[in-house]
Amino acid sequence: MKKIFLVLCLMVSLPLFGQYKVDTTITNEAYTAYVNKELGQALYVKYKLYKGGGKCQRATNWVNDTKLTLVNENQYKGTLYDKGHLANAEDFAYNCHLDSLTFRDYNRLPQTRKLNRGIWKVSENEIRKMSQTDSLMIYTGGHWGSPNTVVNGIKIPSVCWKVVYSLSLKKVVICTIFYNTDIPVKTETNLGSLELMLGYSLNVFVDNKKKKK
């Protein structure tokens, strides 16, 4: 009961109104990115993961292969924020082309170094391990509180989040919020509460109704 109360209190501290909405969708061979053009960033991405991992050498150059004006590489320079992957590069390391597609400007959000290299990375590794025995749909993105923190013209998400849907169990098995702070913490929640905070539906059950392992 205390944990539920804590989650609700944390969510109440994040505004529910005036949130950014998806206005552009970008799909490549690896994932789909749901972008807001005002932000110049993805609100979230979605991809299927089964037996993730491999030996491909990690790419290093980020690319904008669209005509959209997106947050660019130069804006990150001199900041204390990492370029945090949404669709994780290592998840696609079994195919070097797919791996390279994760280095797109619409597949990252600014994350504190301690988040990106800490509990976020741990979560990525745990999900990839799960994918060795189950086919998963991954939804991962950010949420911007008010007032926005803005660094070099980049609006910084207050939180990042992950939802994992098991295609074999036909249910959400992970729904986690990560606070994008210098001392990052995570909290487990449920899909309904997350969508209430975001102000839009992820259509998890609609998307996966006809999918099979």
Located regions from the model:
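Cleaved targeting-peptide boundary
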Residues: 17-25
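Domain-level detector of nuclease and nuclease-like folds
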Residues: 66-213
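Short, His- and charge-rich active-site/binding loops that engage polyanionic ligands
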Residues: 24-82
